[in-house]
């Protein structure tokens, strides 16, 4: 079978960086270099060029999809003779630990909020829907954080279901990476956004991923457009270790940090510890639960060195 025939048979349209960048059209750059610097993650290189060539075309595509969705809602309201409720357009962002999901989410939030048609863009991470540490300890799951069984999926599904049902005020729990736990009584209220960006490891998972907790509705059932941020495993491991080393010199030095003891490690000890955490927890979760969901995404961003996106695949 020829490459051309294989391309025709795939459910995705494939673009290299230059082809994708050309789809920006005339969308203006609405972020300054200072704003971009504030949006990037602790271990990522996010440049003006990256935003212009990757994220502006993506924001343009999403604007088309969102506008189409609003027109469809208007048609339904006309048919029913009703004044419709504000129903948010939900974008999910999945991918491995350390791949840069949070940066992608923050950049898209900033860009989409600047489109005149829809200014209210909320960003929620699924970390808040992890079971509290006390529950995880009781169930012997502290080393399984991020795995399907560590989440309160019923609460997460209810959260997105309520938003899609037009409930005006919906609360989401908030997670603190400092204390490595859900913040008690720290819920965030989400008030009828035009767009919700939902970022997390598990947002593309379905019933096959939860045999231990069978239920019939999943987050992915409520998502309008899903993004998977991808990268080769060797890069993911390197990024994870580098991020751990930066935390060792930064966040871990806070006496209130759950991982304060790691700040006392030598660099060699820290690298060894990070490697162990990667192999025994994060790599395992990637292979078993995250990577298998990649082909369910509407769009796949594949990164190379320095977190630069080199390929984009868009579902037909």
From Swiss-Prot:
Alphabetical list of Pfam families matching this protein: PRK
Transmembrane segment boundaries: none
Compartments, as annotated in UniProt: Cytoplasm
Notes on activation and inhibition: Regulated by feedback inhibition by CoA and its thioesters.
Keyword Ligase found: no
GO BP of this protein: coenzyme A biosynthetic process
EC number, UniProt record: 2.7.1.33
Keyword presence, Magnesium: no
Alphabetically ordered keywords of this record: ATP-binding, Coenzyme A biosynthesis, Cytoplasm, Kinase, Nucleotide-binding, Transferase
Disulfide bonds, paired cysteine numbers: none
Gene Ontology MF terms: ATP binding; pantetheine kinase activity; pantothenate kinase activity; protein homodimerization activity
Superkingdom of the organism of origin: Bacteria
Pathway connected to this protein: Cofactor biosynthesis; coenzyme A biosynthesis; CoA from (R)-pantothenate: step 1/5
Residues the entry annotates as binding ATP: 95-102
One cellular component term from this protein's GO annotations in UniProt: cytoplasm
Catalytic activity: (R)-pantothenate + ATP = (R)-4'-phosphopantothenate + ADP + H(+)
InterPro entries the UniProt entry points to: P-loop_NTPase, PanK, PRK/URK
HAMAP family noted in UniProt: Pantothen_kinase_1 (MF_00215)
PANTHER family registered for this protein in UniProt: URIDINE KINASE (PTHR10285)
Protein family (similarity comment): Belongs to the prokaryotic pantothenate kinase family.
Protein known as: Pantothenate kinase
Organism: Escherichia coli (strain K12)
Gene field: coaA
């Amino acid at each position: 079978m020829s490459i051309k025939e294989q391309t025709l048979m795939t459910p995705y349209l494939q673009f290299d960086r230059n082809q994708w960048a050309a789809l920006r059209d005339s969308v203006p750059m609405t972020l300054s270099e200072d704003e971009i610097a504030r949006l990037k993650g602790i271990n990522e290189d996010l440049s003006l060029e990256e935003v212009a060539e990757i994220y502006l075309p993506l924001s343009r595509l999403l604007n088309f999809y969102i506008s189409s969705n609003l027109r469809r809602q208007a048609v339904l309201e006309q048919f029913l003779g009703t004044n419709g409720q504000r129903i948010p357009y939900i974008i999910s962002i999945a991918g491995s630990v350390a791949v840069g999901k949070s940066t992608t989410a923050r950049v898209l939030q900033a860009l989409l909020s600047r489109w005149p048609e829809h200014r209210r863009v909320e960003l929620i991470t699924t970390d808040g829907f992890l079971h509290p540490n006390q529950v995880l300890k009781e169930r012997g799951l502290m080393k399984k954080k991020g795995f399907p069984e560590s989440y309160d999926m019923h609460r997460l599904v209810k959260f997105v279901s309520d938003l899609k049902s037009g409930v005006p005020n919906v609360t989401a729990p908030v997670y603190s990476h400092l204390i490595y736990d859900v913040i008690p009584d720290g819920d965030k209220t989400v008030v009828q956004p035009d767009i919700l960006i939902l970022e997390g490891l598990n947002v593309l998972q379905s019933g096959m991923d939860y045999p231990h907790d069978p239920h019939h509705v999943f987050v992915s059932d409520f998502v309008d457009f899903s993004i998977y941020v991808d990268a080769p495993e060797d890069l993911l491991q390197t990024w994870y270790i580098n991020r751990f080393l930066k935390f060792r010199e930064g966040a871990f030095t806070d006496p209130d940090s759950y991982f304060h003891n790691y700040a006392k490690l030598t660099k060699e000890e820290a690298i060894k510890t990070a490697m162990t955490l990667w192999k025994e927890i994060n790599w395992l979760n990637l292979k078993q639960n995250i990577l298998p969901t990649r082909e369910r995404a509407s769009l796949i961003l594949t990164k190379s060195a320095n977190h630069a996106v080199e390929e984009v695949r868009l579902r037909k």
